Amino acid sequence: MGILAVILDSVCERCSGSSLWMLSTVALLSILVVSVVINVLRQLLFKNYKEPPLVFHWFPFIGSTISYGMDPYRFFFNCREKYGDIFTFVLLGKKTTVYLGTKGNDFILNGKLRDVCAEEVYSPLTTPVFGRHVVYDCPNAKLMEQKKGPNGVFDVCKTIAEITIYTASRSLQGKEVRSRFDSTFAELYHDLDMGFAPINFMLPWAPLPHNRKRDAAQKRMTETYMEIIKERRKAGSKKDSEDMVWNLMSCMYKDGTPVPDEEIAHMMIALLMAGQHSSSSTAAWIVLHLAASPEITEELYQEQLRILGHDMPPLTYENLQKLDLHAKVIKETLRIHAPIHSIIRAVKNPMPVEGTPYVIPTSHNVLSSPGVTARSEEHFPDPLEWKPHRWDEAIAVSSEDEEKVDYGYGLVTKGTNSPYLPFGAGRHRCIGEQFAYVQLGAITAALVRLFKFSNLPGVQTLPDTDYSSLFSKPLGNSKIQFEKREPVTKA
């Protein structure tokens, strides 16, 4: 006690002569050091061998959030090498169990509704973007009109975002909606996209700059759709066209309740987001790869000449199905650059992992990353090389006799045993998969028949990937050169 008293007296004496700022700093540092020590001791001394191994981390709450957020795939592969296919890491205070490989995809994406829940995870992200009571909140011609010279430089991400929002709005929502859109709407959708920042899993309401832009964009988009609906209601039942807005305006829920106008507007935001977002990222990667591989661009052009003819008829759905190499370019780009790197579910019941001693508790989330199998040497030789011709040989991506399930939008294969799942699997598999292939095919074919692409002088590599949002896309400067093709003359 004598020694302790001396120490306390010494501390009190020093504190009495220190400023409040200094004392606050010392206190915060002390709390930080103590929390780190306790966190490390808990990991080393109190391991639960019935749960998957926990990725070592220094700071509580933060855990592995930074290393995961900077490059998810590098994080996954590094952890896989150290811990195996099943491991747990702390993501913004929440223990998240990752299960990689085809077995992991099946375990999570085909998890029973009573065991895993997507709504609980994604609602804080999607509700402020789409609006309430929709999605997870409920139980190319125009480019050519923007004339440029015969050659020049353009920003791929910005331009492709405009193209995809024009094509998606016209094909999914009709002529009137498309007529309301200009290039500023691509910027609004970018602001909505930033609402999917990982921090919004925990703090969707935080008054951060990207959240203020998200809310303003959501309000502007809702007002645009509400104006269209209001004008149509005022005009009565007379239809000048058939589109999704008209369709929903006459729809009812099972109990006979008409779909409210605000919910229709929010559904339209979600529909356009689904039709624009991942397609925009994928189409941008396609163009960037074509600029880095001009020989593939020329092969695509020659395929159109050979199959469609030198008169280059307008693109139709039937014509797109004949362009085999175009389809392979899309598949290969989706393989390397899957728009969503992490698919997360909340655990609702303890989940035993077959063949292991692990039981995943309800305090965890579970995470599947189909992009890991698509980038694995065991399934695809030279997995990080962009090689559309790898698809010339049959690659087992699905099985005809695989079990099929109807989740409410028609029979689809469960699909989770495939190493190639760019559109996910299970009950939350992307229902717009076929539309995406048609949209990407039309954009790719239209650009290839009109332009040649090349990298800027001195540029040898593609941009890195931006993982700052839930949806990955090219990072930073994505400018390339274009050159208009000369009209084809018949031989």
Curated annotation (Swiss-Prot):
Which reactions are catalysed by this chain? a 14alpha-methyl steroid + 3 reduced [NADPH--hemoprotein reductase] + 3 O2 = a Delta(14) steroid + formate + 3 oxidized [NADPH--hemoprotein reductase] + 4 H2O + 4 H(+); a 14alpha-methyl steroid + reduced [NADPH--hemoprotein reductase] + O2 = a 14alpha-hydroxymethyl steroid + oxidized [NADPH--hemoprotein reductase] + H2O + H(+); a 14alpha-hydroxymethyl steroid + reduced [NADPH--hemoprotein reductase] + O2 = a 14alpha-formyl steroid + oxidized [NADPH--hemoprotein reductase] + 2 H2O + H(+); a 14alpha-formyl steroid + reduced [NADPH--hemoprotein reductase] + O2 = a Delta(14) steroid + formate + oxidized [NADPH--hemoprotein reductase] + H2O + 2 H(+)
A GO BP entry is: sterol biosynthetic process
Per the UniProt entry, the effect of residue 401 to N is: Leads to resistance to voriconazole
Where is this chain's protein located in or outside the cell?
A: Endoplasmic reticulum membrane
Annotated Gene3D superfamilies: Cytochrome P450
Give the record's pathway: Steroid biosynthesis; sterol biosynthesis
Q: Which Gene Ontology CC terms are recorded?
A: endoplasmic reticulum membrane
Q: Classify the protein's membrane topology as the record does.
A: Single-pass membrane protein
Annotated transmembrane regions: 20-40
Q: Which UniProt keywords apply?
A: Endoplasmic reticulum, Heme, Iron, Membrane, Metal-binding, Methyltransferase, Monooxygenase, Oxidoreductase, Transferase, Transmembrane, Transmembrane helix
The signal peptide, as residue positions, is none
Q: What induces it?
A: Over-expressed in azole-resistant clinical isolates.
What are its E.C. numbers? 1.14.14.154
Q: What positions does the entry give for heme binding?
A: 430
- Major localization listed first in the record, in broad terms: endoplasmic reticulum
Looking at the keywords, is Transferase present? yes
Tell me its cofactors: heme
The entry lists its GO molecular-function terms as: heme binding; iron ion binding; methyltransferase activity; sterol 14-demethylase activity
Quote the InterPro entries the UniProt record gives: CYP450_sterol_14alpha_dmase, Cyt_P450, Cyt_P450_CS, Cyt_P450_E_grp-IV, Cyt_P450_sf
The protein's matches in Pfam families, at most eight in alphabetical order, are given as:
p450
Q: Give the family, as the similarity comment puts it.
A: Belongs to the cytochrome P450 family.
The record's section on PANTHER family has: 24-HYDROXYCHOLESTEROL 7-ALPHA-HYDROXYLASE (PTHR24304:SF2), CYTOCHROME P450 FAMILY 7 (PTHR24304)
The UniProt function text for this chain reads:
Sterol 14alpha-demethylase, encoded by cyp51A, cyp51B and cyp51C, that plays a critical role in the third module of ergosterol biosynthesis pathway, being ergosterol the major sterol component in fungal membranes that participates in a variety of functions. The third module or late pathway involves the ergosterol synthesis itself through consecutive reactions that mainly occur in the endoplasmic reticulum (ER) membrane. In filamentous fungi, during the initial step of this module, lanosterol (lanosta-8,24-dien-3beta-ol) can be metabolized to eburicol.
- State the protein's name: Sterol 14-alpha demethylase
Upper lineage is: Eukaryota, Fungi, Dikarya, Ascomycota, Pezizomycotina
